[in-house]
Amino acid sequence: MIRIGDGRKSDSWAEINVVVDIFRSTTTIPMILFRGAKYILPFRDVRKAIEFKRRNPGTILVGEKYGIKPPYFDYDNSPAEIAEADLSGKVVAFTSTNGTYVLSRIRSGRIIFSSYVNLSATVAMIRSQRDVLILPSNRPIGKAPEDILFANLLKLMAEGHEVDVSEYTRKTEEINRNIIAGVGERDLEFCLRVDHTNIVPEYIDGRIVQSPDSVALTDA
């Protein structure tokens, strides 16, 4: 069974929990791994991420807080920016307003991250699972319609329904135009890019890595 919850309010979990934050965390996270990062360490607190880099100088800092790149960070929470970065073999410390908050709330089950950039790979991974919870990250002040829209798309596709993905990306683009200080054009283009990668990130033992299941999909 595939259910849709609320990343900020749900208090029960599934065997597989799918975090969705279209603008921009769950688009950026697959791109970090796609660009060669060894693994990602998620932080809710910017200061703790900076302190980690101070103790581990080779760390790359990526993220934002309330839409703004923090001081001392190497990259914004920007899939377009990350797409041009060489992260080969690097450890990335990552923080964001919504995605890492939702991650911190989940208490059981596997945790994976999905967006348009790894849509088909996510569908392939969850469609045969018996207990899946899709968690739109939403926002501190309320719902995020782009996350809810994608969650419904992911559910329909995983259940075997035929859908017009372009209609969902079109609606998502419209949503962005109505958001105050919405995503910039370069990031928007990346956030709407379908199946850019087969990588499905998974949170395992405190690190975000390429899911072993998505490795199998890539090799197939």
Swiss-Prot record:
Any one GO molecular-function label of the UniProt entry: 2-phosphosulfolactate phosphatase activity
SUPFAM superfamilies in UniProt: ComB-like (SSF142823)
EC number(s) stated in the UniProt entry for this protein: 3.1.3.71
Record Pfam families: 2-ph_phosp
Alphabetized InterPro entries for the sequence: ComB-like, ComB-like_sf
Disulphides: none
Keyword field: Hydrolase, Magnesium
PANTHER family noted in UniProt: 2-PHOSPHOSULFOLACTATE PHOSPHATASE-RELATED (PTHR37311:SF1)
UniProt similarity note: Belongs to the ComB family.
Descriptive protein name: Probable 2-phosphosulfolactate phosphatase
Organism: Thermoplasma acidophilum (strain ATCC 25905 / DSM 1728 / JCM 9062 / NBRC 15155 / AMRC-C165)
Name of the gene this protein is made from: comB
